[in-house]
Amino acid sequence: MTDKQETTQPAEKLQQPEKVAENVDPSLELNKTKVNFTPEKTDVNTYKFYPDDPESTLNRYRFAVKGASEYYDPCQESSKMSFKCLELNNYDRDLCHDYFDAYRECKKQWLKARREKREFWE
């Protein structure tokens, strides 16, 4: 044996750092019990089918400061939900159709906002 013996650390000391959400909007509600997609008004146009807010100030800022070749998705949480649905349902796309629709609606809202108010997104 050598003078320097390797010491192994107990498993308690080798804890992984907490996983930090990489791109989460602080206004995004992640607690499932507090999420309410039904509107307070009876107007159908106030329905929201996805958790993201693609027109938020934070999303505008992140889009403006990203590099020219970087991809930014303001509907990231909806995207994650659709992939999670696929994983849980053995990649059966028919069972996750609603999640795909929610992601699509979020992207439509974002693109429409960018077209209508270009000066806010540059």
UniProtKB/Swiss-Prot annotation:
Presence of keyword Disulfide bond: yes
Principal place of residence: mitochondrion
Motif Cx9C motif 2, residue range(s) on this chain: 96-106
The protein's role, per its UniProt record: Required for the assembly of cytochrome c oxidase.
Origin: domain of life: Eukaryota
Subcellular location as annotated: Mitochondrion intermembrane space
Gene Ontology CC: one annotated term: mitochondrial intermembrane space
All copies of domain CHCH, residue ranges: 72-114
Origin species: Kluyveromyces lactis (strain ATCC 8585 / CBS 2359 / DSM 70799 / NBRC 1267 / NRRL Y-1140 / WM37) (Yeast)
PROSITE patterns: CHCH
Motif (Cx9C motif 1): 75-85
Protein name, entry field: Cytochrome c oxidase-assembly factor COX23, mitochondrial
Cystine crosslinks: 75-106, 85-96
